């Protein structure tokens, strides 16, 4: 599978770089994990917005789902112009005010996400893990038909169950909103030291620190994470391409 990081900033875009969005492609199938602010515009550097038939939302905070209505409007236009016969499928938690909007939309279909529910989309098997975050939030694990594994933690504090969920990932994208020394448990985030701990204990082949803060020296996040024995570890970059 091919993964393209569309955006990775926390809270709001930085310049022309969006918040959370991860495009995954294989065998003619494209899925999008999260549709944060700026993702609908930036994704068009890599594919047509009309080629995205499946969007998985980890939760409905704006930096993870702010552009979902732009994708819905794009699909409405494509359907009305007869460019496609398919509805846009939007997978997400059942709690959240946007769910009513999605359910009412004529050209979009809501697909509920739960920790016990899996979906198969083309060559991908998609699984979920309930996170520790103020709103209903899920980590997402994507396994392709050749056994390649991509895991996106989304927003969460550190949990042993998250280690088990992410174990053995080829690529693990971890929430790293906070620098070491900040306690993110109350707001459901990981600092860099805990991100490194998760990477180490889950034995990920490559770890990418994402949901990045807008302040400080980002290289310090890597230094903190590397206190734990990890394999390859990098900071997320908009436009980064990864082959699994």
Please provide the spans of the model-predicted regions:
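Active-site metal-binding motif and surrounding structural segment of the metallo-beta-lactamase
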Residues: 38-87
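Conserved beta-strand hairpin/beta-sheet module of binuclear metal-dependent hydrolase folds
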Residues: 1-47, 136-154, 171
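Active-site neighborhood of phospho(di)ester-bond hydrolases with catalytic His/Asp-centered motifs
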Residues: 32-36, 53-59, 63, 67, ...
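Metal-dependent catalytic neighborhoods of phosphoester/phosphodiester hydrolases
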Residues: 66-75, 100-101, 217-225
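Active-site-proximal loop/helix segment associated with metal-binding centers of metalloenzymes
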Residues: 13-17, 117-180
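Metallo-beta-lactamase
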Residues: 83-137, 144-146
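A short helix->loop->beta-strand "cap" motif at the edges of active sites that frequently abuts
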Residues: 29, 78-79, 83-88, 202-206, ...
């Amino acid at each position: 599978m091919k993964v393209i990081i569309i955006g990775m900033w926390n809270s709001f875009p930085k310049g022309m770089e969006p918040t959370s969005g991860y495009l995954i492609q294989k065998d003619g199938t494209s899925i999008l994990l999260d549709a944060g602010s700026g993702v609908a515009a930036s994704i068009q550097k890599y594919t047509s917005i009309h080629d995205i038939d499946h969007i998985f939302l980890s939760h409905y905070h704006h930096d993870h789902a702010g552009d979902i209505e732009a994708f819905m409007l794009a699909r409405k236009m494509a359907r009305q112009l007869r460019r496609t016969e398919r509805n846009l499928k939007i997978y997400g938690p059942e709690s959240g005010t946007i769910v009513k909007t999605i359910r009412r939309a004529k050209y979009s279909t809501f697909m509920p996400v739960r920790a016990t529910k899996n979906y198969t989309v083309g060559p991908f098997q998609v699984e979920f893990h309930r996170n520790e975050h103020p709103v209903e939030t899920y980590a997402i694990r994507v396994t392709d038909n050749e056994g390649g594994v991509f895991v996106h933690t989304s927003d969460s504090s550190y949990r042993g169950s998250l280690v088990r969920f992410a174990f053995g990932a080829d690529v693990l994208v971890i929430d790293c909103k906070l620098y070491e020394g900040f306690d993110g448990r109350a707001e459901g985030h990981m600092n860099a030291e805990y991100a490194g701990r998760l990477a180490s204990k889950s034995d990920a082949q490559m770890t990418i620190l994402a949901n990045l803060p807008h302040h400080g020296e980002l290289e310090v996040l890597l230094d903190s994470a590397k206190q734990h024995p990890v394999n390859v570890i990098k900071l997320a970059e908009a436009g980064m391409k990864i082959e699994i």
